[in-house]
């Protein structure tokens, strides 16, 4: 195979790579401010690598979310909620309504303050 044959082969491989790209993206339920079961699905963008379900009172949020931002602080700020029960997961359609009954994380700002206060007191007592 000469130079021309190698170039043709390379070109074909490049075209195959472009057209056969799997482009797999995570699929999540997405119904912001929903109070009922969510049945609308969406394909998440590449920077949103997890599905979120968060419950605050009667409001239930379903959406794509960045996994590293799945913390009480981030969720509380973004959703403007003071108390949340939430769950982030990384499988297709894993943020279904019943998942919070089986687990999830419930925190409020008061709980976070109660958890942090002993550590602050200990650090303060160690400081001369």
UniProtKB/Swiss-Prot annotation:
GO terms for biological process: negative regulation of activation of membrane attack complex. Residues 1-25 form the signal peptide. It is found in: Cell membrane; Secreted. Glycans are attached at residue 43. The keyword Lipoprotein applies. PROSITE patterns: LY6_UPAR. A lipid is attached at residue 102 (GPI-anchor amidated asparagine). Keywords: Cell membrane, Disulfide bond, Glycoprotein, GPI-anchor, Lipoprotein, Membrane, Secreted, Signal. One of its GO terms (molecular function) is complement binding. Disulfide bonds join 28-51, 31-38, 44-64, 70-88, 89-94. It is a lipid-anchor; GPI-anchor. N- and O-glycosylated. SUPFAM superfamilies: Snake toxin-like. Pfam families: CD59. Residues 26-108 form the UPAR/Ly6 domain. Potent inhibitor of the complement membrane attack complex (MAC) action, which protects self-cells from damage during complement activation. Acts by binding to the beta-haipins of C8 (C8A and C8B) components of the assembling MAC, forming an intermolecular beta-sheet that prevents incorporation of the multiple copies of C9 required for complete formation of the osmolytic pore. Interacts with T-cell surface antigen CD2. PANTHER family: CD59 GLYCOPROTEIN (PTHR10036:SF24). This is CD59 glycoprotein. It comes from Callithrix sp. (Marmoset).
